[in-house]
Amino acid sequence: MIELERIRGAAERARPHVYRTPLMPVDGALLKLECLQPTGSFKVRGFFAAALALPEERRRAGLITVSAGNAAQACAYAAHALGVPCRVVMYETAPATKIDGVKRWGGEPVLMPRPAVLDWLTNRGWESGPEAFIHPFADPEVMAGHGGLGLELVEDVPDLARVVVPVGGGGLIGGTASAIKRLRPEVEVIG
């Protein structure tokens, strides 16, 4: 589990750049509307938290990540807002909307065939450039930033009993569950 102070610090760093999203009641449940974030997903929380945790000199060199989806856009958006360059390694088959989203925020998509992306990851290809690599879901600061969502749920829903979290790479549930369990261990978190 991620430490509560790390989550609070990450959420505080990201706060000026993300929205505290509302909850919408639907059939007895509450939906956290992260689709209202600037890039349409929760990913901006983690990328701002991670980028702002970097030493300033390292951050100024730029950001780099690997993603064919929402993390790609979140990295580009965070870099744009912080005034630093960004490259995103993407599968050449990435959806055009995601490639365009990276470009819209001034990021540079680096399109590669799938085997080349996997080789780049295996061989730590990001070390050949000056940018700071932010893993799209396994970076501890990314997960802590996503934990801000859990903090908001605990604050906004006094009778919180159960939280259902979608799971892809695991960064969202890692951060959200850590925040919730640190504050309210009796709450059931389902992925």
Regions found by a protein language model. Name each.
Residues M1-G191:
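PLP-dependent amino-acid enzyme catalytic core
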